[in-house]
Amino acid sequence: KKNIILAGALTLMAAAISACAPAGSNSNKKGLEAYQNGDYQNAVYLFKQAITQEPSEDAYYCNLGQAYCAQGYYEEAIESFTQALQLGGSSFYSYRGMGLAYNGLEEYEKAIESFQQAIEAAGSLDSSCRLDVVGYRAEAKMKLGDYEGSLEDYNELIEAGYRLRDIYQLTGNVYLLMDDVDQALHCYQECLDIDNRNYEGYLTMADALKKAEAEEARKVVLNAALEVIPYEAKDWCYRGRIYLELEQTDEAFSAFEESYNKGYAQAGYYLGYCYELQGKSEEAINLYQEQIKHDPQDAGLYNQLSSCLVRQGEYQDALIMIQKGMQLADESQMADFLWNESICYEKMGNYDTAIEKLMSYLEQYPADKDAKKELAFLYSR
């Protein structure tokens, strides 16, 4: 068998590559490397090249499907996975990939069916492969509104002792959707008992509780995070984010300043944001500009600066920063730049260009409902 891309476990894990399969063709190997590096467009090209060289190799179609999935081209991904299945191999990985693609298309019943087929095809594969898919199925059931079914799957993972920290958190999210705040908090506490320094977990839980309008429970989680003693510069940055969630801007500023002074550059993003909250936009802009001098290749800094300039109504200057940032941005950063670019042209009264930019944005992010509403608004202008 050839190398096959393995998607990660649950929504919280990154994609991984099978370590046990022997090497494929040279194009496939290069495609795998491109995929690992996040260069999905090139990965698609290379996997197609591998298929041209060996059109009967099912693993190449499976890899192509995963690369399409990573770009959000779910229908193309399903076609590739279907072709892999027709060639008679990679059934577990292809069914799993189809499930992920149907998830992306919000066709959750089909996703659940595909995940079930993957589970049945797992055979002698390592048990973690099957449990991964149980987690995906639980998520699809949750999105379909089958909360009891989702809990059943998550409880199976808990009984198996599988990735307990993440699973307890996801289980808590399901209980929130069922309006059972007490049970959700219990699951969150189980999660934090496993790792009480999981700052990202505190923030994610607080966000879920905010959406559930469970404000008191949200404050319990955030205040629990403040009881954790910060040791490293990054810890201080997380502490600042917790304070921001509690709307304690002065304390947040001090924490971000501590983090930034200790050498954690990303704290500068939040420090600038705090300046903006304090009405000190010039200080924010100066901070971002100073950071860019020290790290001119950081696309995130251009994003922060351009966003700040947009909020200040300095659209021409914002466009300059957007163009510079887009030259450095990876796929995960492009959405903000493209969105802000369309906003700048709209605010400047150039509606035709704004529509053109927004249509370009929607070609890459077709699921963005806010962008569709904005496009309809622009047409009305």
Regions found by a protein language model. Give the residues of each.
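Start-of-helix register in tetratricopeptide repeats
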Residues: 25-26, 59, 93, 128, ...
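Canonical tetratricopeptide repeat
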Residues: 29, 63-66, 70, 97, ...
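Residue-level recognition of tetratricopeptide repeat
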Residues: 32, 66, 100, 139, ...
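Register position in tetratricopeptide repeats
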Residues: 36-37, 70, 104, 143, ...
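Short coil turns that delineate tetratricopeptide repeat
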Residues: 55, 89, 123, 162, ...
